[in-house]
C-alpha cells in the first residue's frame, strides 16, 4: 500500500513520525465514451476561450475571479509561500468525546501507521485515547488544501477521518418536512418496532455486495455472448402502511 502523506503527529511536546494511507478504494466499472457512428474514443482538449488555441498543462495557471473576466493569478510558487504548520505535521489542537462529533461531518478515512522511530509514541497515543475514550482534532495539508481531521483508535491502530468544516455542512432545516411530526397509531408503531427487532442482528458487512455492479457485469457478458437480458418483475404494491408492515413481518418470519 502506498502512503498518501508522510509527516508527523504532534500533541503537546510529543512528536510522532507517521505515514498516512487511504483506507478505502473505488471499485467502480470504468467506461470510455465512444462515438456511436464509428466506435472511436472521445477525447477532450484544453482550449483557451480567448485565442482558441489548445494549451498544455505547463501553460495553465490558477485564477481567482474577483469580477466578471477579472482574475487574480496564482502560481505554484505562490501556493508554496503560504505559511502553514499543517504541511508536514498533524497538530492535535484538542481531545474530545467521540459522541460529540456528528456523522454528517465525516468525509473520508485514512489509516495512520508509525514511521521509523515512532512506534512507542504511536502506541502510547493510541492506548491513552482508548483508555480515556477520546478523539483528537487538528489540521493537515494534503493535495493543496488544509483539511480538518480527527484521530481515533481503531482495530489495533489509529484511523484519521477527514472532516467537513462547519460552513460546508448544509442545515437540514432548509428541507421541507424535516423534523415534522406525523400522526401515527399505536398499532402502527408496535408493528414497526416488531419489524425492526425481527430484522435486527449482528452486522456483517461482508454480506452486502454491490449488486448493481454485478448486474452490470452480467449485462456486459450477456451482450458479448449475444444472450437475451431477463428483467425481473417489480415488487407488488401494498396499498396501506399497516398492510405493508403486516406483510413485511410475515416475510421475515
From Swiss-Prot:
<comment type="subunit">
    <text>Homodimer. Interacts with LigD.</text>
</comment>
<keyword id="KW-0227">DNA damage</keyword>
<dbReference type="GO" id="GO:0006310">
    <property type="term" value="P:DNA recombination"/>
</dbReference>
<keyword id="KW-0233">DNA recombination</keyword>
<protein>
    <recommendedName>
        <fullName>Non-homologous end joining protein Ku</fullName>
    </recommendedName>
</protein>
<dbReference type="InterPro" id="IPR016194">
    <property type="entry name" value="SPOC-like_C_dom_sf"/>
</dbReference>
<dbReference type="Pfam" id="PF02735">
    <property type="entry name" value="Ku"/>
</dbReference>
<keyword id="KW-0238">DNA-binding</keyword>
<feature type="domain" description="Ku">
    <location>
        <begin position="9"/>
        <end position="192"/>
    </location>
</feature>
<dbReference type="GO" id="GO:0003690">
    <property type="term" value="F:double-stranded DNA binding"/>
</dbReference>
<dbReference type="InterPro" id="IPR009187">
    <property type="entry name" value="Prok_Ku"/>
</dbReference>
<dbReference type="InterPro" id="IPR006164">
    <property type="entry name" value="Ku70/Ku80_beta-barrel_dom"/>
</dbReference>
<dbReference type="GO" id="GO:0006303">
    <property type="term" value="P:double-strand break repair via nonhomologous end joining"/>
</dbReference>
<comment type="function">
    <text>With LigD forms a non-homologous end joining (NHEJ) DNA repair enzyme, which repairs dsDNA breaks with reduced fidelity. Binds linear dsDNA with 5'- and 3'- overhangs but not closed circular dsDNA nor ssDNA. Recruits and stimulates the ligase activity of LigD.</text>
</comment>
<comment type="similarity">
    <text>Belongs to the prokaryotic Ku family.</text>
</comment>
<keyword id="KW-0234">DNA repair</keyword>
